[in-house]
A protein has these predicted regions:
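A structured beta-alpha segment of the ubiquitous adenosine-cofactor-binding alpha/beta core
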Residues: 35-62, 72
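Glycine-rich, N-terminal phosphate-binding loop of Rossmann-like dinucleotide-binding domains
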Residues: 66-68, 104, 153-154
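Internal alpha-helical scaffold of NAD(P)-dependent oxidoreductase catalytic cores
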Residues: 114-128, 139-168
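NAD(P)+-binding Rossmann beta1-loop-alpha1 motif at the extreme N-terminus of oxidoreductases
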Residues: 1-28
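Alpha-helix C-terminal capping/helix-to-coil transition sites in glycosyltransferase folds
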Residues: 59-60, 96, 146
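Rossmann-like NAD(P)(H) cofactor-binding subdomain of soluble oxidoreductases
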Residues: 71-136
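Structural alpha-helical scaffold elements that stabilize or flank donor/cofactor-binding regions
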Residues: 56-57, 93, 143
Length: 168
């Protein structure tokens, strides 16, 4: 919502209908101080577009941020089902040179597996890791007043593009 508020055209792909309906009303489906007003303003300006469709959002996107849940498995390891599902859905629809930014906290080596998935699907996407450092209840201020941004990838131009988004 903050990137949309900054003027970027942002699609929010939310497969859960109840959550999507909440976002469409200008609210968050979880409490975060100040977030509802940011969502509402971005919706009103037309820069935030909530959808359940990768088909609507991915083909025209130059940069795709993947921010999905990584719940714990019973053994305590991260369940990466949503991470790989989002990467696959994006890869199927993205144009070449689309920058795919992984925001979710994932184990070391996950990025290489996502890159292998892109190769397996014969897609030339640029993978960038950009883990978020957000605390529940203060995520909005953590995003606005960050003390560091960690961005990494094999393609320097893709990394620079992601950094430019933060600096604007």
């Amino acid at each position: 919502a903050l990137l949309a508020h900054a003027g970027y055209k942002v699609y929010v792909v939310e497969p859960n209908k109840e959550r999507l309906d909440v976002i469409k009303t200008g609210r968050s489906f979880f409490f975060e101080e100040g977030l509802d007003s940011v969502i509402k303003l971005a919706l009103q300006s037309g820069t935030l577009i909530p959808t359940n469709s990768y088909e609507e959002s991915v083909p025209d996107s130059q940069v795709v941020f993947s921010c999905v849940g990584t719940p714990d498995n019973p053994d305590g390891s991260s369940n990466l089902t949503y991470v790989f599902s989002a990467a696959e859905e994006t890869a199927k629809l993205a144009k070449p040179a689309t920058i795919y930014v992984q925001k979710s906290t994932v184990p070391v080596g996950t990025g290489r597996k996502i890159e292998a998935l892109f190769q397996e699907l014969n897609k030339k996407l640029e993978y960038v890791s950009n883990p978020e450092f957000l605390r529940e209840g203060t995520a909005l201020s953590d995003t606005l007043f960050f003390d560091r941004v960690v961005v990494g990838g094999d393609n320097q131009a893709a990394v620079d593009t992601v950094m430019d988004i933060y600096m604007n």
